[in-house]
């Protein structure tokens, strides 16, 4: 779990992951990069993260991936991230590409639905909670 202030340096993060795993006899490193879109008058997105719950969520994913001899990685921004820059990079490393391709999709979708990260639009330098694009965390009472 890598948390950064502001935009992510995608090339640096993915190169670090590649260098870490290239000699581990893995056949696949699949990545997903989320880029902030320019829409609805936003100049940026802003993120708050509750790291203790996020770590538990990631630990559960690591256990799941381990059962398939795979490993999940991710980096996310906190604070403001301007349009056309990245706030999220996820990766799956596996000896088998089919496992990595399946897990990256499941990981990204579960992240969107369950990770304790709150998103705000930044419009005219004002931070506005993006409730319509956010998901309630089941049983947490958040976003009720």
Predicted regions mapped to residue ranges:
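N-terminal, polar/charged subdomain of small-to-medium soluble alpha/beta proteins
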Residues: 1-86, 93-95, 99-105, 109-144
């Amino acid at each position: 779990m890598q948390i950064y202030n502001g935009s992510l340096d995608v090339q640096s993060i993915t190169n670090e992951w590649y260098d870490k795993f290239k000699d581990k006899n893995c056949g696949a490193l699949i990545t997903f990069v989320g880029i902030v879109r320019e829409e609805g008058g936003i100049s940026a997105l802003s993120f708050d993260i509750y790291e203790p719950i996020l770590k538990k969520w990631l630990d559960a994913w690591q256990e799941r991936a381990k059962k398939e001899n795979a490993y999940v990685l991710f980096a996310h921004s906190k604070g403001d991230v301007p349009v056309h820059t990245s706030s999220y990079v996820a990766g799956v490393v596996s000896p088998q590409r089919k496992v990595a391709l399946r897990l990256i999709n499941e990981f990204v979708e579960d992240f969107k639905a369950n990770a304790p990260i709150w998103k705000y639009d930044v419009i005219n330098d004002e931070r506005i909670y993006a409730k319509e694009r956010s998901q309630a965390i089941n049983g947490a009472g958040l976003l009720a």
